[in-house]
Amino acid sequence: CRGEGVYVYDNSNTRFIEGMSGLWCASLGFNNKDLVEAASKQMEKLPFYHSFAGKVPEVAANLAEKLVGIAPEGLDKVFFCNSGSEANDTAIKVVWYYQNAF
């Protein structure tokens, strides 16, 4: 099996349109050469780092600054997650904390 652009291919090399974006984790398609190159470069530097200790990799800090720069006024905090589920879970916890429900 493999993916190419908006298509996936089965073991018989039959091509199908993958209309669900890999369940939302491949919204830019499969095997995008620019994304493969960028991800490969980053994997060589630092593939993952937690933020538990209040430290952040330079690449994440730079991206956060760019996001704040284009966000509407007042949206000046950035929290990186691994998935939409993690983002939603964290957002709910922040609201609970803010409302003193924790």
Briefly describe each language-model feature range.
Residues 1-4:
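Short, small/polar residue-rich loop motifs at catalytic or cofactor-binding pockets
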